[in-house]
């Protein structure tokens, strides 16, 4: 349906929460993840349209921060690709190692943002073995 799923954050500090929201919106395995952010104005200036769609994430305060870039045509995908490249060149990206992801999960569990029981069995097992939770 020519869409691209994205998460809206207010600041760079929310990137980790967005990464966990993304990961917990599906059955996932522990892995590293790359995240880049694009300013809303860049999307507007490239005529990229979006609409809010609640996510099926386990992070309840991120459910309504999920958006779809909609009606994407070939040129739009090219524009988004160029925006991503520009952001990477301007150091507006973050790489979360597998350990960073585990730490984010543990932090979310300890802050009661995430219930460990909502995680896939294999992920729970690793967190229990490595962190004793």
Predicted regions and their residues:
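Conserved NAD+-utilizing ADP-ribose enzyme module
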Residues: 2, 11-133
């Amino acid at each position: 349906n020519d869409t691209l799923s994205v998460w809206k954050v207010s600041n760079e500090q929310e990137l980790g929460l967005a990464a966990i929201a993304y990961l917990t919106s599906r059955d996932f395995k522990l892995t590293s993840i790359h995240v880049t952010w694009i300013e809303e104005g860049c999307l507007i200036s490239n005529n990229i349209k979006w609409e809010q769609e609640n996510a099926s994430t386990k992070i309840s305060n991120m459910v309504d921060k999920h958006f779809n870039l909609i009606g994407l045509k070939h040129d739009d995908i090219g524009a988004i690709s160029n925006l991503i490249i520009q952001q990477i060149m301007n150091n507006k990206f973050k790489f979360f190692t597998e350990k960073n992801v585990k730490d984010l999960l543990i932090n979310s569990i300890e802050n009661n943002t995430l219930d460990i029981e909502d995680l896939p069995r294999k992920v729970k097992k690793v967190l229990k073995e490595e962190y004793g939770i």
